[in-house]
Amino acid sequence: MRDSPTHKEQRAQNTMSDQMPFPFNNFTYFFTLFSKFFSSFHHCTCSLSVSRQYLALDGIYHPLRAAFPNNSTLRRHFTKNRTPRHTGFSPSMTSCSKEHRQGTAPKLPSPNYNSGTEGTRFQI
């Protein structure tokens, strides 16, 4: 029985570890949406702002189709269509500038908005 590997075996082990960056113990493959590609790490396809159930944080398997609405191409626009304003240009492809819009412009904050009555004191 030998205590240590020979120089040739040690060099072969070092070469193999340089070529294989992933350990074989508990190694799993995660498949992406494209079946011909695979990876050893998760590929997220949704933002972290989606609800808890779509991230499968509740420990239950949820089908992929549950994360996407059936009518995703038929979504309604949530912004109101404004009536176009006249800019004086023909055809009117530009929007009205701030001076020509109806109503008052929003009041800008004071340049001393975050300043207190006393000066800032830094202590070390």
UniProtKB/Swiss-Prot annotation:
Keywords: Mitochondrion. The keyword Mitochondrion applies. GO terms for cellular component: mitochondrion. It comes from the Eukaryota. Residues 111-124 have a biased composition (Polar residues). Its main location: mitochondrion. One of its GO terms (biological process) is regulation of cellular respiration. The keyword Mitochondrion applies. Residues 80-124 are annotated as: Disordered. It is found in: Mitochondrion. InterPro entries: TAR1. May be involved in mtDNA stability or mitochondrial gene expression regulation at the post-transcriptional level. Encoded on the antisense strand of the nuclear 25S rDNA. This is Protein TAR1. The gene is TAR1.
